[in-house]
Amino acid sequence: MATQRLGFRDAIGWLSQIIGPDSAYVRLGIVYTVAISLLALATPISVQLLINSVANTAMPAPLWALSGVLLLLLLLVVALSALRVWIMAGFERRLFSRIVAEVTLRAVHAQDPFFTDGNRGDLFNRFFDLVVVQKSVPSLVIGAFTIVLQAVIGLTITSFYHPVFLAFNVVLVAAIFMVWLIWRRGAIGGAVALSHAKHKAAHWLESVGGSNGFYKSSRHLDFAMQRSEAVTASYVDTHRRYFRYQFAQTVAFLLIYAFASAGLLLLGGMLILRGQLSLGQLVAAELILSGVFYGISQFGWYLDSFYELVASSEELSLLFAIPQETTVRGDHGPRDGAVKLTDVVLDGARYTLALGAGEQLVTVAEPGAERRLAMLLKRHALPERGLLRIGGADPGSFDIYRLRSDVTVLDRSTIVEATIRQYLRLASEDLDEVAMEALATVGLERRLASLPKGLDTQLGSTGYPLSVGETMALKLANALLVRPKLLLLGQLYDLLPPERLAAALRLLKAHGTTVLLCTGRPEDLELDGYLHLGMTEQRRFDRLADLQAVANREGADDASA
């Protein structure tokens, strides 16, 4: 991205995507800004009237009347300014609510929901760029747009004072426009690259924080420091390139401010000396244009805020660009857990397999075969070819959420960050005796009783303070409450005592749940049969010895290869 040419059109595209749905707030803020800018001219115009008329009469009544009108106009400015601030605060709340809702939906409906597996977990750090958008938009609407509008109005009014002022204002606008054109593309691209460098550094620090003490050794510490220095150097270098453009613009605007202020005084003085301009007009022009010139001197700061807004909008657009799965809305889920795969191909794996409803098989799987099958059953991936049926029907005809409620895959030790009570309530709203019996069945009753907060213990994403085996047992207890039609258990369940696992499977058997138990210890349990789940061939056996013979033969073939 650092070398990609980005321009104003790209910036408008990102801003439209992020801010566009809430643009009504921005438009209303701009309307208030227009009114405030027009009313703000009351002061210089009042001064001009004071000098040209009131001073000549030397009477207090016109002075009081003029001051009273000015006070009323300024109080109206105060009221409109307060309303504008209130509207922008509403914009911040509305923007936050909408972005949170949309990102949640896009994450839930992601085509590939395993963000951590693809090293994309840091993608959601982009959410914090929302704060920049929240603060930059009101600042630009209230500050920058006010400056621009007051400049337009002020330059228009003073242009009618004298043709020389008109020419002066045209040159001033041309100079401002040239400063914007010359450095805008480099500044926009540099701001986006700088934001990316910031997130790369944050991703690295996040990985250090999640290393669980891995870097607490001399060799690993050296690597961590070198990597930190590398991401720091990358950020500093990127910031230096961006600052080159932004600083050049800032200096250019400051120079315009200096030359324009001096030039106005020189031109105004010359016109007064020639009798072509009144003193009141010069004072009014100075009051109007001095504010314009000061605003020009602040353009560099506001453009920096604009570039940050563009970069943050680009980062947020990455969340909106998460590929979404095609949602198929049926009106039902599978009738039972029967599974049939006929020449189903996915990513180099081929499956031809049939399971009856309620069957439970001890399964020995080749590396990768179990994971691909799980992706197919949960419809996280679609077959490249072949036919897949669950409950006698094509999974594409089901309500996708009903399907994923009825098909459960437990093959990871990670768990949602919630309390144990909240996690169990995802399966059953009432933590009655059934839930307690499920915990007792998997052997967690005593362990949970030993925790200081019991069921209210907060779980980390790794399951801590529970061990890996205990976390998998908790997930199995959840499955006992859900009673899915089809359940695939990964090899991590080898960590559970066989008698606990057998007891849980008996309960599932009573409810008609089809189970594939992938294990590295097929001799520990005796179920309805045995399955060898290969990448290209699947074979069922009635006897353990036959399964072990095939597994040993393939292991010997792999070793010789």
Feature locations, PLM:
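Membrane-integrated ABC transporters
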Residues: 1-42, 56, 60-66, 88, ...
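Hydrophobic alpha-helical segments in the permease module
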Residues: 69-81, 172-175, 249-260, 266, ...
